[in-house]
């Protein structure tokens, strides 16, 4: 069975590699040290510090595995390889809802780089699905829980 790929820009992959390095070189040794200290307190059956450190160790190791998988199966998307005005991963899109003056800006990123609070939406999101492949001036229908609506793509730029 083929492994799932994780579309992302090179910048996103670099960020994941930096985060992985932080987990392996800083967080993992810190947790090991906390476990060592907690063990020195004696009886592990009622040692909350030990339990908390082991829980944190499991979390850190899980995060390391997730990041290693995403990096190993990263599919680097070169936004320069698509038309300048075409929506793709690594592009910033300004849209206007048809019939209104409401405008929104979205930065399309791979799922690993999504952060709705900074306007970075996953390529797997309904909004990105509706926009990817469209060009400046095109209309796109976005499906939302409140119903569907149309937007016009006002501009498309490469995200820095």
From Swiss-Prot:
Pfam families, per database record: GreA_GreB, GreA_GreB_N
GO biological process per UniProt: DNA-templated transcription elongation; regulation of DNA-templated transcription elongation
Residues in coiled coil: 1-72
Record bears the keyword DNA-binding: yes
Keywords: Coiled coil, DNA-binding, Transcription, Transcription regulation
A Gene Ontology molecular function term of the record: DNA binding
Lineage: superkingdom: Bacteria
InterPro entries cross-referenced by the UniProt entry: GreA/GreB_C_sf (IPR036953), TF_GreA/GreB_CS (IPR018151), Tscrpt_elong_fac_GreA (IPR006359), Tscrpt_elong_fac_GreA/B (IPR028624), Tscrpt_elong_fac_GreA/B_C (IPR001437), Tscrpt_elong_fac_GreA/B_fam (IPR023459), Tscrpt_elong_fac_GreA/B_N (IPR022691), Tscrpt_elong_fac_GreA/B_N_sf (IPR036805)
NCBIfam families documented for this protein: greA, PRK00226.1-1, PRK00226.1-4
Function: Necessary for efficient RNA polymerase transcription elongation past template-encoded arresting sites. The arresting sites in DNA have the property of trapping a certain fraction of elongating RNA polymerases that pass through, resulting in locked ternary complexes. Cleavage of the nascent transcript by cleavage factors such as GreA or GreB allows the resumption of elongation from the new 3'terminus. GreA releases sequences of 2 to 3 nucleotides.
Family the UniProt entry places it in: Belongs to the GreA/GreB family.
Record-given protein name: Transcription elongation factor GreA
Provenance organism: Streptococcus agalactiae serotype V (strain ATCC BAA-611 / 2603 V/R)
Lineage, broadest ranks: Bacteria, Bacillati, Bacillota, Bacilli, Lactobacillales
